């Protein structure tokens, strides 16, 4: 299972939110590159980089940070936050992203999102299916759509999508444990999908459980920044899997 630390960016700084609420912002580090290098030094190979300014303004903003981390580490970066146009994707990939995550666009403009899957390949495009009471949430979680989560994922699986990041908003940034039941349900109803669990990870013991469920990866944010899970523990998990 991939261990994928998260770096969320506002104003070029590394922050965390609770339940996606911009008013709960805590700045953890002024220098995201420093944070990324620290992850890499502990054997981490993947990074989930989110442009929260971009998510709010519906266009890519913090691509310079992406460029910096991609050029000065070997981390495989998936980048998301407000990607809406072909130009946004071009900038993201040219700046060094390995994959991009599209969430709101997949709900609001499925034609464009499907074109991306065809144009860039299913290994490059991740479906960001953020859930609120098993409905899909969009626009940095400021809106809830009418889309039911599992049919939404199944529909895109039929279009060729392979990777899905699912964040249960009720859990995100709350350090209350992940949505094991929700992930088990998704995995049983979408055979073959590479599911990346996100939101609520709070202790190291949850990681083997997610691996056992069959998750492809797990994104860890606040638990790292608040030392609930140490980088040493992650390093051992990566080495021993």
UniProtKB/Swiss-Prot annotation:
Keyword line: Amino-acid biosynthesis, Cytoplasm, Histidine biosynthesis, Isomerase
Pathway of action: Amino-acid biosynthesis; L-histidine biosynthesis; L-histidine from 5-phospho-alpha-D-ribose 1-diphosphate: step 4/9
Catalytic activity: 1-(5-phospho-beta-D-ribosyl)-5-[(5-phospho-beta-D-ribosylamino)methylideneamino]imidazole-4-carboxamide = 5-[(5-phospho-1-deoxy-D-ribulos-1-ylimino)methylamino]-1-(5-phospho-beta-D-ribosyl)imidazole-4-carboxamide
EC number: 5.3.1.16
InterPro entries: Aldolase_TIM, His_biosynth, HisA_bact_arch, Isoase_HisA-like, Isoase_HisA-like_bact, RibuloseP-bd_barrel
Catalytic residues identified in the record: 8 (proton acceptor), 130 (proton donor)
NCBIfam families assigned: 1-(5-phosphoribosyl)-5-[(5-phosphoribosylamino)methylideneamino]imidazole-4-carboxamide isomerase (TIGR00007)
Entry protein name: 1-(5-phosphoribosyl)-5-[(5-phosphoribosylamino)methylideneamino] imidazole-4-carboxamide isomerase
Source organism: Flavobacterium psychrophilum (strain ATCC 49511 / DSM 21280 / CIP 103535 / JIP02/86)
């Amino acid at each position: 299972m991939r261990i994928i630390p998260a770096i969320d960016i506002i104003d070029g700084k590394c922050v965390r939110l609770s339940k996606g609420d911009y008013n709960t912002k805590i700045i953890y580090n002024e220098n995201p590159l420093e944070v990324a290098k620290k992850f890499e030094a502990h054997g981490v190979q993947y990074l989930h980089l989110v442009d929260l300014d971009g998510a709010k303004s519906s266009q890519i903003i913090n691509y310079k940070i992406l460029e910096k981390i991609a050029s000065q580490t070997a981390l495989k970066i998936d980048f998301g936050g407000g990607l809406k146009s072909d130009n946004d994707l071009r900038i993201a990939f040219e700046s060094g992203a390995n994959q991009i995550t599209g969430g709101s666009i997949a709900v609001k403009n499925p034609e464009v999102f499907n074109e991306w899957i065809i144009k860039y390949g299913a290994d490059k495009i991740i479906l960001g299916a953020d859930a609120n009471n098993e409905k899909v949430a969009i626009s940095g979680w400021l809106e809830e759509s009418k889309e039911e989560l599992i049919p939404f994922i199944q529909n895109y699986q039929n279009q060729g999508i392979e990777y899905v990041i699912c964040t249960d908003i009720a859990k995100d940034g709350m350090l209350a444990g992940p949505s094991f039941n929700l992930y088990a349900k998704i995995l049983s109803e979408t055979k073959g999908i590479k599911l990346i669990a996100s939101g609520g990870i709070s202790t190291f013991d949850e990681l083997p459980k997610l691996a056992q469920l069959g998750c492809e990866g797990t994104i860890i944010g606040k638990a790292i920044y608040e030392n609930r899970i140490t980088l040493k523990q992650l390093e051992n998990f990566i080495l021993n899997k």
